[in-house]
Amino acid sequence: MLCACSGEQFRFEDQPGSPESLATRDFSASGLSSRNGGGDWDSKLEDIQVDEAESTLKEALSLNYEEARALLGRLEYQRGNFDAALQVFKGIDIKVLTPRIIKAIVEKTLPCKPRSKAVIVPPTTMSMHSVSLLLEAILLKARSLEELGSYKEAAEECKIILDVVENALPSGMPDGISGFAKLQDIFQKALELLPLLWKKAGNHHETIASYRRALSRPWNLDPQRLAVTQKSLALVLLYGSVEACPKDNIEEAIVLLMLLVKKMVVGDIQWDPELMDHLTYALSMTGQFEVLANYLEQTLPGVYTRGERWYLLSLCYSAAGIDKAAINLLKMALGPSESRQIPHIPLLLFGAKLCSKDPKHSRDGINFAHRLLDLGNSQSEHLLSQAHKFLGVCYGNAARSSKLDSERVFLQKKSLFSLNEAAKRGKADPELDVIFNLSVENAVQRNVQAALDGAVEYSSMVGGVSTKGWKHLAIVLSAEKRLKDAESILDFTMEEAGDIEKIELLRLKAVLQMAQEQPKKAMKTCSSLLGLIRAQEKSEQSESLLQKFETEAWQDLASVYGKLGSWSDAETCLEKARSMCYYSPRGWNETGLCLEAKSLHEEALISFFLSLSIEPDHVPSIVSIAEVMMKSGDESLPTAKSFLMNALRLDPRNHDAWMKLGHVAKKQGLSQQAAEFYQAAYELELSAPVQSFI
């Protein structure tokens, strides 16, 4: 044993220029001494001194064969002679020594028993110093193989260290036992090295197994070192698969990353921004956006600016389908407290985008877009084009919800101006959304030719079947009364459309057939539509959408039967629709029309008012109430006129309301006014689509 060396060893230790015994020098897994890197070894010892030390070790009678090889192999490794080191290490038969190593480790962990001075430790018991020396030799052998590119063999050698120590310490590394520091250091380096070797060898399964093995027992890893291992395992689980990552792997990675983030929050480990990035990716992959928002809220102040925090949280809530919460967070950036802060560009752009999707928040969207445009020339043309696009959409939505005619006209002009500005700024690389939104806004404002040009341009630029584009084109063609062309486009589109898209197209086709006075064809189309809806597999995400489609299909079929005068069949269809969606304003309006056809005026009024109780601004129901009032006598004409004026305030282009307003004026003896109302109804009907443009 080296610890029982004779004077030969002391003579080696006393040599000039060698302040430490070679047998007791600490060695890191990178092949460097505890004091200096491998590159400093030659500066510490002259070549002649290394040769002399090597010769001395070979002649030292106190070292056994394996220990001498361990020391000689270490010297060769430190000098960069990996082939030579490997040859030396191969002479150590670790399989023969394993039982003695395990026994030595086990005996070291046993509680000390009182013994007489006459008791002598058996000479066959290996000291912990020798155990560490031999295990270090295996580690260096693995390192040598790694340097020579033999990664699989290196991993198998490294695994020996783990097998030996785990057999001796099945419950993990004990605390407070003297003489274990060197052993623990070597073992922990082997724990960290093994998965890296398997990774280099291309064995994904063994890499994961090695990381899990390192985390399965308490090996006294310091918190930061343990965190690095946990992070490495999480990254391999997330990104290591060649194909799609298995669900179990993602879940395990999420648990590991959550633990690490919690440790960061309480200060157990250093802050690592990459952990939040990886957790964001993992939770996004599994759709757990609200959980991600919760972890973002736990991050310490200063990690993100307030703008960044609101932006990230709003992304989470929006992805989770909680747009209202997302918009409320984004609106904080518009408050007076943020006026002195540097504007967060992505936040403003995302705020404008979210608000453009919801007409209720169109005013907030206008504010977001204006804040972005106020930054002026400091932004790219693309960004300014996006800001103008969302501004135009928000102006259009605001116009449709405006109660004042003057304001509505002003907002409509602003909408077209902003969308045209977006198109002009992106002229070099036209954006499809800009062209589409501009076409829709032109259609809503009954600029039918401009809308048609935009719809055709959009469809041609898509370069394939775009259900959204072709559907819009069909509706625009219906506004030009080119109903056959519109139906042909739908037939063409349905050949390539998916099932959900085909449902929307079939519904529009049925409406087109009704407009062409083809009720039997429309009935057949509605039947096909219902069959397609029922054939769909329902999931949590699609169930509500399919239920909405089926409700509308039954209501459409009721309208078809109503056109044919088959009111009992129409009522049956409406009962089916009500069983799926009781609180449907259109359903109650159609029910009222059926009752009105049977001259049940009071019951019809009840149905119409039920519709308005669900949606107070439901224009068809308001017009229906006015029509019933008109039949109740001349004394009800002012009330009917009031309802019709309210309908036109909500929808100024409703030709049906203008027509009935003409009837009211005619009954009141206002012939000139009636003629003007009829003229307005006629002109609006010429450009009226069979289905809303929005």
Curated annotation (Swiss-Prot):
InterPro entries given in the database record: NPG1-like (IPR043376), TPR-like_helical_dom_sf (IPR011990), TPR_rpt (IPR019734)
Gene3D superfamilies found in the cross-reference section: Tetratricopeptide repeat domain
Leader sequence segment: none
Region (Disordered): 12-40
Organism of this sequence: Arabidopsis thaliana
GO molecular-function term, one example from the UniProt record: calmodulin binding
The protein's name: Protein NPGR1
Keyword Membrane on entry: no
Taxonomic path: Eukaryota, Viridiplantae, Streptophyta, Embryophyta, Tracheophyta
Keyword Transport: no
Keywords associated with the record: Calmodulin-binding, Repeat, TPR repeat
Tissue and organ distribution: Expressed in pollen, flowers, fruits and leaves.
Oligomeric and partner information: Interacts with calmodulin in a calcium-dependent manner.
A GO cellular-component term linked to this record: plasma membrane
